[in-house]
Amino acid sequence: MRLIVAGAGGRMGRALVRAIAETDGAVLAGALEAPESELIGKDASVLAGLPASGIEVSADLWSLSAKADGILDFTVPAATIANVAVAAERGLIHVIGTTGLSASDMAVIRSVTSRTAVVQSGNMSLGVNLLAALVKRMAQALDESFDVEVLEMHHRAKIDAPSGTALMLGQAAADGRKVGLDQRAVRGRDGLTGARKAGDIGFASLRGGTVSGDHSVIFAGPYERITLSHHAEDRMIFAHGALKAAKWAFGKEPGLYSMSDVLGLDV
């Protein structure tokens, strides 16, 4: 399977290049960066700490996509939305791990899924997706006397909050209780907020150091508390998850899929 890595010079992009090199049946077919990037023309494999592959970083997705089967996209919303149109036109499988996507961004992504297979998830790791399944079941089993709080921590360079994974876990809790997350989410409390409302789903974000990703979902009830947690020790778990998603989507009918579909989980 021939794959393009979008954002090839970033932390996740370099991890994806390494994951492709470690995955049987996967080949690096292209490396994409923004036109103004100083990495244009550099060997993508060398940037990832590997022997030279001859695949140079380019800003031209249209040309790269002529000899590719899919694109792995962990970039920023504006870049992902620009890539969506080209991927759909070329019929590329599009694996999207970009976080911070708005409702309008998701509408654009959905609009192309009649033409190609898209796998979109706030987190590509097996552990987090299993955690989401557990959170949904826990929320189904516990009534609103158990307050739900989602706590996440990431490295100092992360630019969006709450993380896509935190929102995914909050959505799992909302789905378990059959409520809308938009109506129940409370983000970043500060000042005189008043008492907590029953049924709220709270979010808190921490930033610092080099943390790849820590997430906890707390169910706080009368006189007891249940905490479900996941700690990512290396971003390679996300990269290998993205490879798994791409291989799973190869040959699938056009549509919008999630990692729950890839892993066969009921979330």
Swiss-Prot record:
Its recorded name reads: 4-hydroxy-tetrahydrodipicolinate reductase
Q: What does this protein do?
A: Catalyzes the conversion of 4-hydroxy-tetrahydrodipicolinate (HTPA) to tetrahydrodipicolinate.
**GO molecular function terms attached to this record:** 4-hydroxy-tetrahydrodipicolinate reductase; NAD binding; NADP binding; oxidoreductase activity, acting on CH or CH2 groups, NAD or NADP as acceptor
E.C. number: 1.17.1.8
Spell out the Pfam families in the cross-references. DapB_C, DapB_N
Native organism taxonomy: Bacteria, Pseudomonadati, Pseudomonadota, Alphaproteobacteria, Hyphomicrobiales
> By its UniProt entry, which SUPFAM superfamilies does this protein fall under?
Glyceraldehyde-3-phosphate dehydrogenase-like, C-terminal domain, NAD(P)-binding Rossmann-fold domains
- The first-level EC class reads oxidoreductase
From the record, give the cysteines joined by S-S bonds. none
Q: Where is the active site?
A: 154, 158
Gene Ontology cellular component list:
cytosol
Q: According to its UniProt record, which reaction does this protein catalyse?
A: (S)-2,3,4,5-tetrahydrodipicolinate + NAD(+) + H2O = (2S,4S)-4-hydroxy-2,3,4,5-tetrahydrodipicolinate + NADH + H(+); (S)-2,3,4,5-tetrahydrodipicolinate + NADP(+) + H2O = (2S,4S)-4-hydroxy-2,3,4,5-tetrahydrodipicolinate + NADPH + H(+)
Matches recorded under PANTHER family: 4-HYDROXY-TETRAHYDRODIPICOLINATE REDUCTASE 1, CHLOROPLASTIC-RELATED (PTHR20836:SF0), DIHYDRODIPICOLINATE REDUCTASE (PTHR20836)
Q: In which pathway does it act?
A: Amino-acid biosynthesis; L-lysine biosynthesis via DAP pathway; (S)-tetrahydrodipicolinate from L-aspartate: step 4/4
Q: Binding positions for (S)-2,3,4,5-tetrahydrodipicolinate?
A: 155, 164-165
Gene from which this protein is expressed = dapB
Report the locations given in the UniProt record: Cytoplasm
Q: Major place of localization?
A: cytoplasm
On the tree of life, the source organism's domain of life is: Bacteria
Q: Which residues bind NAD(+)?
A: 7-12, 33, 97-99, 121-124
The biological processes this protein is annotated with in GO are: diaminopimelate biosynthetic process; lysine biosynthetic process via diaminopimelate
Family of the protein in this entry: Belongs to the DapB family.
Keywords carried by this UniProt record: Amino-acid biosynthesis, Cytoplasm, Diaminopimelate biosynthesis, Lysine biosynthesis, NAD, NADP, Oxidoreductase
